Amino acid sequence: MESAGFQREKLVELYHREMDEWLQQFDAKDAGFKDGVPQWISALQTGNGWKPMELPAYWETRGLNFDGTVWFQKEVEIPADWSGKEISFHLAMIDDDDITYFNGKEIGRTSGCNTMRTYKISAALAKAGKGVITIRAIDYGCLLYTSP
């Protein structure tokens, strides 16, 4: 690169600056994520366009033909004998990134597609009864050819 007149450090700096700007624009279009704060993690969402989706699957095969952010929720029942114990939670692969919450608390995040996710619900969060898992799944599409 240097022999062609490019300065690697400046190109890397430019890349990171433009990627940060792109991601800020991307996040600004997510109604569930305002000013860096997730909005839909504390309670099971109903109405307001929330529809069931059979998973696992690429959401494009379920009628959502776009790249961007999709929020998923699932109400689960924590058995009494699991109460107060750490629980391992496994997700299938997500294309591309996720942030996962349990009862409003972030329990994990992973960047990159084709990566299995294993998160832990802490013993303090594991209480008998109903709980809500919320996943912010982000599919960036092809970053080189799209706008946010």
Question: Which residues does each predicted region cover?
Answer:
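Predominantly extracellular/luminal regions of secreted and cell-surface proteins
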Residues: 23-53
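Aromatic-lined ligand-binding clefts that engage carbohydrates, nucleic acids, or primary amines
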Residues: 40, 50, 76, 81-104, ...
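Edge strands and adjacent loops of beta-rich recognition modules
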Residues: 47-67
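Short beta-strands within extracellular/lumenal beta-sheet-rich domains
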Residues: 66-79
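Short strand-edge motifs at loop-to-beta-strand transitions and within beta-strands
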Residues: 72-74, 115-119
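Short hydrophobic beta-strand segments in globular cytosolic domains
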Residues: 107-108
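Short, surface-exposed tryptophan/glycine-enriched loops
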Residues: 118-132, 136
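Conserved small/polar residues in nucleotide/adenosyl-binding loops
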Residues: 145-148
